[in-house]
Amino acid sequence: MKAVKMCLFFLFAQAGLCFAQQKQFKALLVTTTKGWHHESLHYGVLAIKDLGVKNYFDVVLLENPNGFTDKYLEEFQVVIFLNTTGDILDSAQQRVMERFIQSGKGYVGIHSASDTEYDWEWYNKLVGRMFQIHPVIQTARIKITDDKFPGLQGFANDKLWTDEWYEFGPEKISGLNYILTVDESSYDPRVQWGEKKGVGMGKQHPVAWYHNYDGGRSFYTALGHLPAIYSDPVFLNHLYAGIFWAATGKK
């Protein structure tokens, strides 16, 4: 009888262990940079790993894209580009990313993910809009433009936010759903880099958006330049909502 009880104990223990290891989804966190390397990258990695612990999803860090293959990506539901810059994937790896999204999975771009892969038209459409220029870091007012998307509660009532405010080029694809904008009357968008000038984007200056693309899902937020942002619960709630939607399609 004692032996039977011991067997049952181990069976239930193993079943409990298997159950405990079942996570909501698995995210691949890509941090490759071939251009500017953000000081905040380290803090972003820690923050997203902590989001995984708190919200019960797995996070795997990929700093070198050499392992970016169809086989490797099979186990993931979402790929996150955290402050990536420059041309980080070769042509074969680009096709892998395309097939990943076409299989019904998701992408999340954070801040300088829009300063990545300018010559890859498919990726430009995946992100939706590409970075052009930015003024100095300033405090400005953020406005919610779609309160039906989750994770935006902390931005209510024209919240003041300090960040690097990207000015974007034209839409690369129609159907972008804007969820946050920045009020240009609350900061100075003017900037000049040599012959390149920034004058702002007017009343509709997007900061975050999402859309369905090529069979999968894409979420992008321009917030996330400064290290301190990655310990702000308002930003982390916003970021997790985007990750969750991109991975699952649920709001």
Language model features with spans:
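Bacterial Sec-dependent N-terminal signal peptides
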Residues: 1-23
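Extracellular ligand-binding/catalytic regions of CAZymes and related secreted enzymes
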Residues: 22-25, 31, 53-57, 187-188, ...
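Helical hinge/lid and interdomain linker segments adjacent to catalytic or ligand-binding clefts
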Residues: 24-116
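Extracytoplasmic/secreted proteins, especially bacterial periplasmic and envelope-associated proteins
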Residues: 43, 47, 75, 92, ...
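Hydrophobic residues at beta-strand termini and immediately following loops
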Residues: 62, 181, 221
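A glycine-rich, often tryptophan-bearing local segment used as a flexible ligand/cofactor-contacting loop or short
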Residues: 87-157
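Catalytic beta-strand/loop cores that center a nucleophilic Ser/Cys/Thr
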Residues: 135-214
